């Protein structure tokens, strides 16, 4: 295990979550509306591959003697998202709200990354994504979405999996520490 310190906004997020009584204050989520013929099993596999490429989504956190550490758990498996059918937009929104309104603190035991494909009609889908803010930021969240979409398109066309655009997190930490020094 390569223990890494919290960097950039992470210490503030960690501390704010410790001080907050809210069970989900540091969860970030959105859904993307998809229309047309979606190969849901293929998209589900592309989601797993895209998440695998972003090592921060396999991050674990521990607090020891007042210090917080994180590490990439290479053995962590990322499950395929569930594929569900909802009778309407309102039912789909209720499914997403139910996920987002549970205890999603970093120590809750809930996954720090969660995806769901919700079919709301023929050729009409919502792709729901939820992350803990310790593992994504405003740049990486849409970057992960774009990479998953690129993987899905490539696989639909029989092309190889696109290379990961993500810098390994250990290199991000090293660069951050050089900048701070």
Could you say what each language-model-derived stretch is?
Residues 2-72, 89-180:
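Acyl-group handoff/entry surfaces in thioester-processing enzymes
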Residues 84-86:
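Short acidic-hydrophobic, aromatic-tinged amphipathic segments that line or gate anion-handling sites
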């Amino acid at each position: 295990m390569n223990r890494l310190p919290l960097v950039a906004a992470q210490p503030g997020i960690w501390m704010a979550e410790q001080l907050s009584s809210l069970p989900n204050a540091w969860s970030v989520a959105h859904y993307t509306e998809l229309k047309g013929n979606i190969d849901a099993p293929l998209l589900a596999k592309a989601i797993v591959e895209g998440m695998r490429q972003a090592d921060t989504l396999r991050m674990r956190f521990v607090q020891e003697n007042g210090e917080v550490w994180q590490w990439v758990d290479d053995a962590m498996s990322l499950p395929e998202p569930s594929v569900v059918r909802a009778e309407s937009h309102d039912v789909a929104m209720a499914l997403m709200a139910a996920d987002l309104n549970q205890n999603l603190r970093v120590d809750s035991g809930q996954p720090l990354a969660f995806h769901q494909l919700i079919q709301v009609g023929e050729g009409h889908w919502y792709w729901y994504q939820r992350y803990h803010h310790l593992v994504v930021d405003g740049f990486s969240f849409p970057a992960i979405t774009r990479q998953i979409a690129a993987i899905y398109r490539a696989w639909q066309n029989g092309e190889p999996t696109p290379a990961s655009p993500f810098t390994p997190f250990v290199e991000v930490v090293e660069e951050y520490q050089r900048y701070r020094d």
